[in-house]
Amino acid sequence: MKDISSFKNLSHYPVMLDQVIELCSPEKGGHFIDCTFGSGGYTNAILSFSNTRVISLDRDKYVLNYASETKRNYKERFTFHNEKFSNLDKVIKKDFKADFIIFDLGISSLQIFNLDRGFSFNAKGKVDMRMGLNSVSAQDVLNKCDLKTLKNILRYFGDEKDSSRIANNIVKE
């Protein structure tokens, strides 16, 4: 198998890169879709194999520089769409046949360590927490919702057992 260890030197690399590459077998060539591009770890590893083509999506505008760099390196073999993966059907042509589709769900270190993004609990700052194309920040939600709504958000969307105490403390501030 090809050595893909250089893709682990990225500012953020996918934790399961080896396993995904082994599973999707890009050494055979093919068409791939990366629905959560991020810094391009999976996409670039796949494109390092000849006869591969990748269409990538990411809703996060902060990844555009990574996508531009990948486009420079792989040209027509790479296509990027700044879209949510829920819009995949609008982005992919009906006759496109993917050999493998990747979804690496969750937050990335790119988002956590950029303090302006408001995902970290380790620093004071605006609570933004937008993954990408949203117009409403977490700060907006906190400032506009009532105590009951905030408790429900924490309980049902955050699976937080202590939602009442947390919501009360947020409202106090």
Where would I find each of the regions flagged by the language model?
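S-adenosyl-L-methionine-dependent methyltransferase catalytic core, i.e., the SAM/SAH-binding region
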Residues: 1-173
